[in-house]
Amino acid sequence: MTDGPLIVQSDKTVLLEVDHELAGAARAAIAPFAELERAPEHVHTYRITPLALWNARAAGHDAEQVVDALVSYSRYAVPQPLLVDIVDTMARYGRLQLVKNPAHGLTLVSLDRAVLEEVLRNKKIAPMLGARIDDDTVVVHPSERGRVKQLLLKIGWPAEDLAGYVDGEAHPISLHQEGWQLRDYQRLAADSFWAGGSGVVVLPCGAGKTLVGAAAMAKAGATTLILVTNIVAARQWKRELVARTSLTENEIGEFSGERKEIRPVTISTYQMITRRTKGEYRHLELFDSRDWGLIIYDEVHLLPAPVFRMTADLQSKRRLGLTATLIREDGREGDVFSLIGPKRYDAPWKDIEAQGWIAPAECVEVRVTMTDSERMMYATAEPEERYRICSTVHTKIAVVKSILAKHPDEQTLVIGAYLDQLDELGAELGAPVIQGSTRTSEREALFDAFRRGEVATLVVSKVANFSIDLPEAAVAVQVSGTFGSRQEEAQRLGRILRPKADGGGAIFYSVVARDSLDAEYAAHRQRFLAEQGYGYIIRDADDLLGPAI
């Protein structure tokens, strides 16, 4: 028994004492296999889940390392049944393997005959299986490779996919490392992905996920399809690939509403390929338009359901998912595991910050008090309207102006979800507003002006949550969001984490109406960043800025 920062409980929850001197080391040790559930001020609650354990196993952690981490940092003896359960759960990964058989094609091989018998009796899985070759091997229809993995995960037997990949159409790509080089963690991430064949790389916003993608493309040396969140991100990818690799402008195509170019490297958006015409997903054929050797899913946690369905049919292609967080608010993390692949590499945000590759950040929650009339409007509103009402209270505008006055020389993003609120803020601050309806050309011109320092403040909607490179943004003020979305909170902080030319830090303000749904959702949103070691400082609007009204 030691005076460690963890209390490990038999219900698979792990309590972390935040103020303990070893809290940071303990958090890093349990992060690969435990998920943060609650993060109040002094004690954080994590849960050890099967999916987290299997992701850890696929990323190279074994049960001995997991047990050692818990025992080393636990204040009291770790319940022995829990340790046994961890060993048993992690041993389930890989008990079934998908293997290419030279005579029979795709097969499911069991290292435990009883497990195969259980699978063969499953009414959903059995129709996807073919002839039984021997006691431990059964044929799998190649078209069912993805769906079999999904269903096996659901019954608690995640299969290790060792069936290999088709190389696709060859297209040589090399990195041009003149004046720059891959950082150690970027190289390790690309190597880990390549060794696993398919899977997800998790890196903080601003840590250079695009370069991990470029390194993977160089390893593949094949035609590549890249799927991103929006057209601005697509063009950013193109600029980066032209600058950092042997690819020329003519080798990279854009498949969008404006252009329909299919080239050796083609970049499209999730919105484009899931657009329906007369009820049909016409552009899903992009997946079959070339013999792609690699498919890259940027911001993989946002993968729409139709793309999941198509990805189930693409299991012979190498697939790389890039993201800052594996959290999906729809709970479909298991589908990412099955269809894109398990987590291959994960770097804690604070580790990358300590190396100087992302800026240190301070997170501040500013609590405002609604006026009597605002409180009455909130109290009498229909339930579905209450969050919008408390998120957009007029009281917040004076607070935002005061925050900006505290940072007159810093480039600032004001971020929200409700367009009326953003338009009002834009008018009050004299700042341009970027939202979904803003033309792509105007959007890019404003982002460029912001990068050059010609525009000091931008008011942005959800369109700026993802993949926008604004290195000198040092202050972000969040006024409203998508309910309790943890991944949105992480992405928004990520907008200001690029290292600054002056080596300075960043400040992320979240302006929240107290005693309301706004405050409840804010607490939920902060969970992921708490898991990464970011603490929120709570400030009262009146104390911090003087009376807001």
Curated annotation (Swiss-Prot):
Obligatory cofactor(s): Mn(2+); Mg(2+)
Keywords: ATP-binding, DNA-binding, Helicase, Hydrolase, Isomerase, Magnesium, Manganese, Nucleotide-binding
Enzyme Commission no: 5.6.2.4
Domain called Helicase ATP-binding: residue spans: 190-344
Effect of substituting E299A: Loss of ATPase activity
Quaternary organization: Monomer.
Region (Required for protein stability or solubility): 1-130
Protein origin, superkingdom: Bacteria
Protein name: DNA 3'-5' helicase XPB
Gene Ontology MF annotations: ATP binding; DNA binding; helicase activity; hydrolase activity
Binding site for ATP: L203, P204, C205, G206, A207, G208, K209, T210
Helicase C-terminal domain mapped to chain residues: 399-545
CDD domains xref list: DEXHc_XPB, SF2_C_XPB
Cofactor descriptive note: ATPase activity has a small preference for Mn(2+) over Mg(2+), Ca(2+) supports ATPase activity less well. Co(2+) and Zn(2+) are inactive. Another study shows equal activity with Mg(2+) and Mn(2+), none with Ca(2+).
Domain remarks in the Swiss-Prot or TrEMBL record: Removal of the N-terminus decreases solubility and/or structural integrity of the protein.
UniProt motif DEAH box: location: 298-301
Single GO cellular component term: peptidoglycan-based cell wall
Family membership: Belongs to the helicase family. RAD25/XPB subfamily.
Function recorded in the entry: ATP-dependent 3'-5' DNA helicase, unwinds 3'-overhangs, 3'- flaps, and splayed-arm DNA substrates but not 5'-overhangs, 5'-flap substrates, 3-way junctions or Holliday junctions. Not highly efficient in vitro. Requires ATP hydrolysis for helicase activity; the ATPase activity is DNA-dependent and requires a minimum of 4 single-stranded nucleotides (nt) with 6-10 nt providing all necessary interactions for full processive unwinding. The ATPase prefers ATP over CTP or GTP, is almost inactive with TTP. DNA helicase activity requires ATP or dATP and only acts when the 3'-overhang is >20 nt.
Catalytic reaction list: Couples ATP hydrolysis with the unwinding of duplex DNA by translocating in the 3'-5' direction; ATP + H2O = ADP + phosphate + H(+)
Enzyme class: isomerase
Family annotation (Pfam families): ERCC3_RAD25_C, Helicase_C_3, ResIII
